């Protein structure tokens, strides 16, 4: 039941991700997916008419909006819409305001999207993984409202990480909750696995798990971290090696993520 309380947008994000893996994907197919969510459609058309993309003639159709923004940007923006739908009131049990949740998800997503390129991984898949990194926390926070309304994560208590607190309060961690939620949305196995296991990538073979650990670590270092996670970020050569990223070459990709982050944060979307 933990997944049923969410809107349909993540399903659209999952299906879009699959579509965009095909370089010959048709505009019509992408527009068809977006039309499943009227609120999303309205936001895209509004975006296409914003100052950044404005044309002489106002845009009235999803097809034109997608054409103007481009597939990659549309995929990113659907992700931002997912964040906005879910994180509206922040995560009360975790003490995370909605703005910080949005910044962390977006920055982690853009970092892993950029780092996926030198690692030879699919950037759209990586972006989705970064974006939905905290989806388990969202599910558990919703659960807390009915099952543990007084539960509050405090970073000081015992000095442990957030997953230990989750196990004590909910009987499961946000990684386990994420697997349940994302499996019910029919996300690809590697996406589910990467998010579910990114707190403990040691010994895992999936590069995306290591990439996500790395991206979340960098996001925290730059000032967009979430409470109680520092202890899960690995500062080892193995993480970079298994992620397929050369530490020396990573800086331009991190800078690029920063540029897109600033743009999307300012976006009227």
Where are the regions a protein language model picked out?
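Conserved alpha-helical "signature site"
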Residues: 1-150, 155-156, 160-237
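Terminal helices and disordered tails flanking the catalytic cores of nucleotide-processing hydrolases
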Residues: 217, 237-269
């Amino acid at each position: 039941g933990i997944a049923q309380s969410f809107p349909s947008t993540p399903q659209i994000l999952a299906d879009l991700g699959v579509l965009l893996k095909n370089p010959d994907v048709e505009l019509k197919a992408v527009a068809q997916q977006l039309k499943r969510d009227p609120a999303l459609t309205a936001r895209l058309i509004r975006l296409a008419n914003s100052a950044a993309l404005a044309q002489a003639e106002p845009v009235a159709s999803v097809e034109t909006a997608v054409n103007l923004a481009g597939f990659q940007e549309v995929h990113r923006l659907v992700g931002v819409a997912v964040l906005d739908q879910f994180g509206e009131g922040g995560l009360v049990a975790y003490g995370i305001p909605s703005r910080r949740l949005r910044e962390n998800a977006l920055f982690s997503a853009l970092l892993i999207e950029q780092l996926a390129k030198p690692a030879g991984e699919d950037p759209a898949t990586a972006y989705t993984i970064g974006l939905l990194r905290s989806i388990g926390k969202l599910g558990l926070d919703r659960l807390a409202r009915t099952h543990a309304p007084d539960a509050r994560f405090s970073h000081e208590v015992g000095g442990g990480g957030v997953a230990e607190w989750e196990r004590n309060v909910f009987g499961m961690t946000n990684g386990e909750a994420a697997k349940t939620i994302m499996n019910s949305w029919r996300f690809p196995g590697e996406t589910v696995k990467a998010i579910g296991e990114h707190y403990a990538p040691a010994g895992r073979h999936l590069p995306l798990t290591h990439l996500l650990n790395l991206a979340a670590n960098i996001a925290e270092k730059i000032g967009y971290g979430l409470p109680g996670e520092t202890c899960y970020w690995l500062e080892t050569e193995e993480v970079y090696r298994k992620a397929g990223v050369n530490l020396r070459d990573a800086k331009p990709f991190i800078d690029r993520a920063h540029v897109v982050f600033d743009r999307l944060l300012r976006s009227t979307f």
